[in-house]
């Protein structure tokens, strides 16, 4: 039976609390690493080696592709082979060196995923430069901070981003002297650059700088830093996470070993759609894996509305996503089902129940119902291009109802992973066809050790019958520290263990369930501790809520919340309950607010929340929390200090009116 399976084994015993240090649970490792962690392929010690050996093995394979635009219309994907890309990388590297850039200097890359992004990155890898992605989603303030903090001397920039980059001047020009466009440069931009003290080149212009010149490539050591990835963080300035060659080589080795053990190996036939930001370690790590096996990377056009069309043209076999993207896929499919008539919906429901039932009995998604796949679910598969064999979700937890739905209807392996920039992405991953792993992030990948550390102030006990505690990671994927912030490094890196700040719970089969966030805890006026992330997960079960931010502080005795209602669900309720007006006015309606508050309270009681954990007032916000207002990080985590600043007046008013109504006994 599946419940008897266990996918981890113990490598070190648990330790009781001593000298003020909390207790820690046993150290566990993936059963795929019974004979030790997998070793990298001979000759691969750096990111450059990953690319160089792929060029040697697969010179004529398609490597990088984009859609050709003719008369404003997108055509087929046009490809560059591994050898063609290599030749451009060498030229670009020669140009870098010819304008005085030396090993160890910092090179910024700013823009949407494209061929030039990867080529610039590989040129950095070739010459031992630190590749510093400049976040496309963070705005000029953060870009300016990163350029100055990392001391970026040259930046490769998407054409459209040149004006944004200029906004960082004059502060950034203390370090940044050269800018290279991924495309062309307008004459007025040349003039502006000159005034700012910058030299700016078009892509073709820059490639010519190194013509006829050759430079010896430096030796790259495993411990050398290859990239500094700045994490937006939910508080304060971005932190520069230093990632070594060894970290990336270790993660690619671990991913290959893991996929090989679950019969989902990557190969040179694989095609990957590149649309998640290369500035994030999730996409960077996956693309390194694709390059290592000689696979193909096709780039989207940069517009989420055109993503499905790009998928249809590219027909990828590997599709990585963040939960928000898969949520949209799920919602879109549900809407189509609702609008397709009673008969179609009934056929779908019967097929879904039948196939899901067989999968629960232990059948693989392929064997569970080939008939239903062909007749009912094939349209879903075609919607993703028709060839997808792996969907991998990462960056945030994927709701289990969406994961189970996709495992049935997408006709492919649906996996969920967990990792941090500091752990170079993958740390846990679910298995194909193991439904016991639904709602978890799976067991550890076979290149890390994991243990839980008790969090007494939150009543999480790593030695309890159901072990819960802060997830701690050990292994060669871990980062080399925060750039210029040894103080912050020491806070999270203790005795070789990375303290993630995430609270997890071991499942009987060795999977990990993320249940809370250690730092998102505060005390109410009466002295009760509130683990706010856990509460938000509970309140998010309310169907009419899309997103919710729960707030409290040590001066108040109760909680309030700002909620983004689900528009269609609330509008449907409004029609049924005689509430008129558009979505904005419905959100301001007292009857709608009372309805949603009632649903939140009902859910709180169903989940046996304590009295002080029940929300006393809610404000309905029609505009979803977004990055444009700096309320979310690029991985869609809530920026709590910024939310408080933005909604300060609303929060103040909610506390005032709720206290008045409580005082009057209403």
From Swiss-Prot:
Entry keyword set: ATP-binding, Fatty acid metabolism, Ligase, Lipid metabolism, Magnesium, Nucleotide-binding
Enzyme class: ligase
Residues that coordinate or bind ATP: 228-239
Region (Fatty acid-binding): 495-519
An individual GO BP term: fatty acid metabolic process
Superkingdom in the source lineage: Eukaryota
Catalytic reaction annotation: a long-chain fatty acid + ATP + CoA = a long-chain fatty acyl-CoA + AMP + diphosphate
PROSITE patterns: AMP_BINDING
Cofactor: Mg(2+)
EC number annotated for this UniProt entry: 6.2.1.3
Record-level Gene Ontology MF annotations: ATP binding; long-chain fatty acid-CoA ligase activity
CDD domains xref list: LC-FACS_euk (cd05927)
Pathway in which the depicted protein is active: Lipid metabolism; fatty acid metabolism
Function summary: Activation of long-chain fatty acids for both synthesis of cellular lipids, and degradation via beta-oxidation. Preferentially uses palmitate, palmitoleate, oleate and linoleate.
Family: Belongs to the ATP-dependent AMP-binding enzyme family.
Name this polypeptide is given: Long chain acyl-CoA synthetase 5
Originating organism: Arabidopsis thaliana
Chain's gene name: LACS5
């Amino acid at each position: 039976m599946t419940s008897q399976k266990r996918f981890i084994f113990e490598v070190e015993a648990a330790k009781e609390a001593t000298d003020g240090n909390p207790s820690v649970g046993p150290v566990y490792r993936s059963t795929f690493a019974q004979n030790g962690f997998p070793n990298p392929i001979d000759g691969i010690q750096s990111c450059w080696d990953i690319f160089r050996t792929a060029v040697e093995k697969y010179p004529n394979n398609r490597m990088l592709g984009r859609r050709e635009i003719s008369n404003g219309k997108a055509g087929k994907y046009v490809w560059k082979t591994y050898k063609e890309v290599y030749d451009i990388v060498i030229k670009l590297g020669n140009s870098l060196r010819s304008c005085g850039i030396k090993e160890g200097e910092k090179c910024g890359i700013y823009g949407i995923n494209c061929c030039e992004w990867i080529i610039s990155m590989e040129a950095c890898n070739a010459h031992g430069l630190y590749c510093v992605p400049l976040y496309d989603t963070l705005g000029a303030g953060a870009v300016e901070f990163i350029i100055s903090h990392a001391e970026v001397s040259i930046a490769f920039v998407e054409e459209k981003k040149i004006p944004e980059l200029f906004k960082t001047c004059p502060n950034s020009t203390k370090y940044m002297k050269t800018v290279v466009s991924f495309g062309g440069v307008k004459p007025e931009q040349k003039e502006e650059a000159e005034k700012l003290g910058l030299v700016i080149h078009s892509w073709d212009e820059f490639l010519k700088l190194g013509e006829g010149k050759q430079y010896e490539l430096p030796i790259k050591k495993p411990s050398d830093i290859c990239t500094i990835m700045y994490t937006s963080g939910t508080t304060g300035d971005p932190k520069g996470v230093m990632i070594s060659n060894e970290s990336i080589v270790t993660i690619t080795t671990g991913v290959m070993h893991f996929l090989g053990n679950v019969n989902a190996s990557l190969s040179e036939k694989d095609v990957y759609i590149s649309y998640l930001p290369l500035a994030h370690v999730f996409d960077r790590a996956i693309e390194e894996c694709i390059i290592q096996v000689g696979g193909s990377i096709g780039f989207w056009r940069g517009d989420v509305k055109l993503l499905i069309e790009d998928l249809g043209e590219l027909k990828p076999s590997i599709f990585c996503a963040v939960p928000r993207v898969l949520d949209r896929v799920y919602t879109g499919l549900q809407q189509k089902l609702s609008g397709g008539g009673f008969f179609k919906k009934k056929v779908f429901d019967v097929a879904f129940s039948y196939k899901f039932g067989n999968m629960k009995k232990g059948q693989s998604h392929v064997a569970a119902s080939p008939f239903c796949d062909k007749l009912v679910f094939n349209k879903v598969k075609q919607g993703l291009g028709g060839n997808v064999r792996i969907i991998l979700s990462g960056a945030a937890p994927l709701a289990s109802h969406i994961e189970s739905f996709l495992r049935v209807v997408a006709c492919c392996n649906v996996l969920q992973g967990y990792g941090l920039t500091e752990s170079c992405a993958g740390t846990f991953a679910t298995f194909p066809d193991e439904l016991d792993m639904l709602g978890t992030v799976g067991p550890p990948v076979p290149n890390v050790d994991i243990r839980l550390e008790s969090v007494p102030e939150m009543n999480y006990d790593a030695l309890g019958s159901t072990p819960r505690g802060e997830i701690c990671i050990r292994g060669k994927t871990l980062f080399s520290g925060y750039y210029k912030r040894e103080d912050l490094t020491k806070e999270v890196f203790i005795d070789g263990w990375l303290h993630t700040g995430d609270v997890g719970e071991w499942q009987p089969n060795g999977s990990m369930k993320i249940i809370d966030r250690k730092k998102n805890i505060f005390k109410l006026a009466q002295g009760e501790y509130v683990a706010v992330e856990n509460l938000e997960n509970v309140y998010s079960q309310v169907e009419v809520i899309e997103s919710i931010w729960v707030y409290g502080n040590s001066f108040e005795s109760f909680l309030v919340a700002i909620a983004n209602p689900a528009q269609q669900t609330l509008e449907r309720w409004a029609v049924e309950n005689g509430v008129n007006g558009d979505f904005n006015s419905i959100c301001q309606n007292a009857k709608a607010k009372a309805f949603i508050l009632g649903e939140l309270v009902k859910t709180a009681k169903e989940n046996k929340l304590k009295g002080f954990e029940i929300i006393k007032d809610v404000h309905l916000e029609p505009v979803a929390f977004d990055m444009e207002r700096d309320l979310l990080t690029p991985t869609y985590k809530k920026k709590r200090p910024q939310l408080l600043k933005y909604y300060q007046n609303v929060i103040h008013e909610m506390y005032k009116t709720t206290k008045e109504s409580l005082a009057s006994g209403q």
